[in-house]
């Protein structure tokens, strides 16, 4: 808590625990100091400095000495108190503003205190690789590969097929060239065109090198309504050998070429393919995730699609794989011919524009790289087929709807209670600590729907087992019974790796592992032995979801059994799936020969452990909290100096790097180090992940299915929960996702940071996941890593109140950030929550439309107001449903915010939520400065809509019992 907050008497109601102890220490210090000072003054003033003039002089001297000796214990005691309080204050520099590191770090030791061995720190170090796009020695496939020529065209009922044959000598630049390909073109629906290029000859041994099995990812099918090839479609496919094979996809209504490979060469090898298309000047592309980035994609970037366990780097590949983009183009009608003409710079806000949006989806699960440059797009992948789906639109909403209905499935419908507020942190140490948080929410009258538990609850970080001391099943039953009677809910985390017990320790038995082993439920090494990596519990094995579909593994049945068995002990209400990229903290099967060392400590310091404290704070903290910032800076500098010394001691004198480069071998794939190196955030594909050569039951390799682990664990969890909760909709939040995961689960944005920049990035991330088919999306409000401060947390709690999934969560090394920790945050939260809870019937309706129609819940302004090109990159505002406009303050220290009121030039009227007044005097595209003092978030209602509301309560159960109303704007 900041010093100025301590002086705010209104904030005293939020002080608890160590915060009060810190304050009391300060108070006692000053009292003790005054005692010492007063006693010293009395001693000095009572001493006789002149000669003794009477016969009682000896008695007076004795009395003075006696008084001095009487005061001496008082002084010494006061000095001791001074020292003790000083120690408390020094040890608690951060406690002025709520730091509680010691209490949360304790969970690290309670869960890992049996560790005998630490996995080597260098065990997660891979080969030195340089991404192809940065490699000066890299070969450009377009300059050396021959391309293909098309022949043997065969008409089909909805399109045609053709043979593609290599047009010259194989280049074998990043794999072994496939000489004979097949082209399949199919008009699947009036708004959807399918283009697939695959090898003509595929055997059982290399089937999964190229074919993505429909048992894992369903393939969009012909809708049965299209009568003849292309006659009803606004899309047209044409091809030519000019001189090598290329194709065009054109929009008939505008004559615009949406995608063309003509003039470039198709490259197709067993570990690499490439095709390219020009893009119009100043193009507007969206999607291609998962990545932390602005909503509209820059015109000079590379998008890598490869699931990675990493803490939200900007512009790096992270957890999910979503190879789809939207392309929006703006046109003006020619005054003479009414012909639509593309406009590269639609800046005239008085002009009338018409937009068209199309979508492109690549059904491919391999590692991919999409190069966006100033005037073209190049698509590369490490395997699979070119399996493209073009969506005609012509609006973003219609593309998203068609994509969901045809390719990935309609989003999961959520239970009503899931729309309430969720509280979590890594560092809640017991059932009692959860109850304390719940009680504090009630004390400060802040709504709380769901309390979550991170890995703290686990017995030595093992799935489906509770800690035997602080999280007993008996105490949990009492806690959950009370929680559920109060209409509240509980969601625990479940990680994706399974502890492998120490064979030399009889007391290390783990029934979950034993049942999985008997079900052939775990991923293997190429030699058939168990693949053993390392995650939180130590050395671990990994569920084989692919083997359950393509082999004889009983992984799904085993997973169902584990959830059902655990539910009988812990009556959870939903499941949080984490680490599902899938993460492993060592390269390769590092635990195969080390199981007798289990349970082992991970090869790095856990957050909050000595030497790994977190002293980071939001941008601007040093201005608004100068005293605390200075103390933190000193501690941080000391810690960094220690780290720097350790690093310098370990450094070698080498100043050059020798990169590993591999070349293709005929008939053999190098899956661990493919010849083409994608720009992967971890470099080596085996770093922080299961190695690409890990083998699934049935013989397929992880290389071909890495991006699907998170998708399939959500599939398994969803269907298991249908059994756990008969007749109820499963509630699941997952980290790693793939195209289609949204039909089973929601998603949170992962391990973000307590920074203003990340609060902003949460908006484009949410809008991107609307494209991907995930209406249930939110982020770690107030930030996961680092330390939030009052202003950031207040603004973020306001912003997230209008996200579909609303949860506050942070890491074990950070200060507590529950909204009641600061009075200003509590007030801002309650005000924003009151609006959210009032709008819950409206939000629930939006979810129903998403689930049944493929609509979006959180919307970009440009989707609703498609013909206003100045909204093309608007990502600091958004719409909740079609009728609620949110304009959050995203800048530290600001008390106003700039925003636009879309549609005002065409008759749209906006009304202030707070006073119901209409916004007037605003022109189309005008940036308006809006008052946004701390505690206020501007919210507006769109005219012409009827909005269902209800009186807000502290829980969904209370809210639904309150009276409802209809608001007409």
What are these regions (language model features)?
Residues 1-8, 97, 101, 109-110, ...:
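Extracellular/lumenal N-termini and interhelical loops of multi-pass eukaryotic membrane proteins
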Residues 1-16, 21-27, 31-67:
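Short, low-complexity, Lys/Arg-enriched N-terminal segments of secretory-pathway carbohydrate enzymes
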Residues 2, 38-42, 80-137, 142:
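N-terminal signal peptide
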Residues 16-28, 70-77, 708, 792:
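Transmembrane alpha-helices of multi-pass eukaryotic membrane proteins
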Residues 117-159, 255-937, 941-942, 950, ...:
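Catalytic-domain carbohydrate-binding cleft regions of carbohydrate-active enzymes
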Residues 129-164, 177-230:
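A low-complexity, Ser/Thr/Gly/Pro-enriched, surface-exposed linker/loop concept
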Residues 230-268:
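Hydrophobic or amphipathic alpha-helical targeting/insertion segments
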Residues 941-969:
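C-terminal low-complexity, glycine/proline- and small-hydrophobic-enriched intrinsically disordered tails
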């Amino acid at each position: 808590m900041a010093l100025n907050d301590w002086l705010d008497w209104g904030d005293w109601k939020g002080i608890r625990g160590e915060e009060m102890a810190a304050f009391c220490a300060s108070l006692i210090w000053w009292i003790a100091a005054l005692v010492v000072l007063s006693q010293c003054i009395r001693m000095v003033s009572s001493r006789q400095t002149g000669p003794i003039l009477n016969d009682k002089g000896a008695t007076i001297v004795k009395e003075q000495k006696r008084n001095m000796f009487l005061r001496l214990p008082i002084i010494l005691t006061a000095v001791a108190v001074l020292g003790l309080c000083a120690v408390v204050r020094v040890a608690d520099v951060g406690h002025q503003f709520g730091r509680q590191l010691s209490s949360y770090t304790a969970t690290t030791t309670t869960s890992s205190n049996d560790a005998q061995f630490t996995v080597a720190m260098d065990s997660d170090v891979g080969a030195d690789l340089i991404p192809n796009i940065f490699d000066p020695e890299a070969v450009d496939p377009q300059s050396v590969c021959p391309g293909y020529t098309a022949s043997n065209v065969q008409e089909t009922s909805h399109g045609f097929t053709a043979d593609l044959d290599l047009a010259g000598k194989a280049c074998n630049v990043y794999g072994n060239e496939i000489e004979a390909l097949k082209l399949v073109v199919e008009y699947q629906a009036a708004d959807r065109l399918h283009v697939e290029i695959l090898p003509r000859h595929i055997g059982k041994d290399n089937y999964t090198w190229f074919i993505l099995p429909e048992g894992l990812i369903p393939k969009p099918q012909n809708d049965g309504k299209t009568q003849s090839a292309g006659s009803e479609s606004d899309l047209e496919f044409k091809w030519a050998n000019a001189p090598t094979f290329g194709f065009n996809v054109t929009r008939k209504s505008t004559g615009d070429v949406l995608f063309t490979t003509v003039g470039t060469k198709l490259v197709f090898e067993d570990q690499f393919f490439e095709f390219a298309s020009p893009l119009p000047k100043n193009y507007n592309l969206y999607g291609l995730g998962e990545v932390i980035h602005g909503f509209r994609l820059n015109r000079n970037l590379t998008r890598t699609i490869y699931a990675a366990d990493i803490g939200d780097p900007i512009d790096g590949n992270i957890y999910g794989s979503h190879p789809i983009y939207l392309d929006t183009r703006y046109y003006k009608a020619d005054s003479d011919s009414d012909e639509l003409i593309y406009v590269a710079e639609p800046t005239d806000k008085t002009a009338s524009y018409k937009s068209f949006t199309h979508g492109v989806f690549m059904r491919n699960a391999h590692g991919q790289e999409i190069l966006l440059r100033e005037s073209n797009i190049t698509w590369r992948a490490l395997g699979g087929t070119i399996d493209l789906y073009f969506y005609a639109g012509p609006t973003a909403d219609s593309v998203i709807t068609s994509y969901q209905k045809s390719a990935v499935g309609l989003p999961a419908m959520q239970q009503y209670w899931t729309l309430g507020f969720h509280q979590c942190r890594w560092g809640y140490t017991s059932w009692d600590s959860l109850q304390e948080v719940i009680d504090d929410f009630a004390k400060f009258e802040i709504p709380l729907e769901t309390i979550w538990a991170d890995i703290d609850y686990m017995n030595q970080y093992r799935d489906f087992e509770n800690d035997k001391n602080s999280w007993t099943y008996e105490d949990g039953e009492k806690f959950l019974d009370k929680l559920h009677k109060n209409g509240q809910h509980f969601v625990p985390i479940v990680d994706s790796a399974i502890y492998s017990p120490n064979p030399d320790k009889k007391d290390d038995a783990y029934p979950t592992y034993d049942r999985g082993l008997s079900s052939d439920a775990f991923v293997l090494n190429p030699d058939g032995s168990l693949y053993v990596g390392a995650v939180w519990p130590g050395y671990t094995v990994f569920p084989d979801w692919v083997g359950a579909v393509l082999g004889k593994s009983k992984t799904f049945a085993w997973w169902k059994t584990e959830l059902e068995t655990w539910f009988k002990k812990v009556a959870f209400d939903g499941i949080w799936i984490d680490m599902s990229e899938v993460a492993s903290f060592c390269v390769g099967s590092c635990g195969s020969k080390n199981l007798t060392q289990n349970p082992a400590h991970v090869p790095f310091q856990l957050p909050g452990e000595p030497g790994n404290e977190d002293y980071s704070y939001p941008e601007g903290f040093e201005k608004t909290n100068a005293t605390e910032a200075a103390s933190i800076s000193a501690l941080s500098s000391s810690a960094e100096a220690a780290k720097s010394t350790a690093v310098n001691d370990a450094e070698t004198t080498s100043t050059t790097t020798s990169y590993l480069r591999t070349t293709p071998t005929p008939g053999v794939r190098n899956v661990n180090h493919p010849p083409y190196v994608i720009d992967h955030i971890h470099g080596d594909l085996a770093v922080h992940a299961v190695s690409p050569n890990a083998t699934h039951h049935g013989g397929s390799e992880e290389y071909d299915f890495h991006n699907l682990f998170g998708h399939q664990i959500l599939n398994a969890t969803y269907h298991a929960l249908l059994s756990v909760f008969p007749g109820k909709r499963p509630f699941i939040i997952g980290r790693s996702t793939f195209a289609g995961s949204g039909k089973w689960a929601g998603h949170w944005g992962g391990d973000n940071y307590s920074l203003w920049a990340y609060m902003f990035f949460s908006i484009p991330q949410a809008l991107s996941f609307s494209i991907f088919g995930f209406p249930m999306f939110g982020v770690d409000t107030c930030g996961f890593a680092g330390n939030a401060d009052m202003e950031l947390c207040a603004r973020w709690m306001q912003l997230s109140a209008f996200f579909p999934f609303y949860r506050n969560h942070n890491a074990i090394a950070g200060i507590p950030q529950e909204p009641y920790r600061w009075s200003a945050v509590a007030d801002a939260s309650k005000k924003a929550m009151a609006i959210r809870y009032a709008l819950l019937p409206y939000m629930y309706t939006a979810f129903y439309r998403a689930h049944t129609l493929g609509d979006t819940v959180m919307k970009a302004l440009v989707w609703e107001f498609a013909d206003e090109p100045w909204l093309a990159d608007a990502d600091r505002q958004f719409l909740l449903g079609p009728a609620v406009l949110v304009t959050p303050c995203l800048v530290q220290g600001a008390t106003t915010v700039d925003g636009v009121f879309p549609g005002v030039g065409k008759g749209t009227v906006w009304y202030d939520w707070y006073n119901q007044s209409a916004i007037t005097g605003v022109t189309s595209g005008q940036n308006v400065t809006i008052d946004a003092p701390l505690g206020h978030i501007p919210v507006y209602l769109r005219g012409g809509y009827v909005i269902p509301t209800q009186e807000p309560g502290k829980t969904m159960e209370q809210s639904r019992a309150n009276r409802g109303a209809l608001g007409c704007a």
